[in-house]
């Protein structure tokens, strides 16, 4: 069955699935098609965040349903540390 995944940019991705596919499998199909890593994807349907181990049937997702994908932002402040190092070096020049 065909489902649609809409991104926050408004792009709609078409994904071929089966009712027994897990959310994790759907995320992998999106990763293969769009290059978005599985661990950065959050899928939402009917206002609920979908869990990787559950199937599409568990959420009553049927053909031509639309899921919404948002990206999980990575934590950390690696960039800020880099800036601090640069500033520290500049102080000695």
Swiss-Prot record:
PROSITE patterns the record matches: UBIQUITIN_1, UBIQUITIN_2
Positions bearing the Glycyl lysine isopeptide (Gly-Lys) (interchain with K-? in acceptor proteins) cross-link: 76
GO biological process assignments: symbiont-mediated perturbation of host ubiquitin-like protein modification
Record's signal peptide: none
UniProt keyword annotation of Magnesium present: no
Prosegment location in residue numbers: 77-93
Keywords: Host-virus interaction, Isopeptide bond, Late protein, Modulation of host ubiquitin pathway by viral ubl, Modulation of host ubiquitin pathway by virus, Ubl conjugation, Ubl conjugation pathway
Covalent link Glycyl lysine isopeptide (Lys-Gly) (interchain with G-Cter in ubiquitin), residues: 48
The protein's name: Ubiquitin-like protein
Organism of origin: Orgyia pseudotsugata multicapsid polyhedrosis virus (OpMNPV)
Phylogenetic lineage: Viruses, Viruses incertae sedis, Naldaviricetes, Lefavirales, Baculoviridae
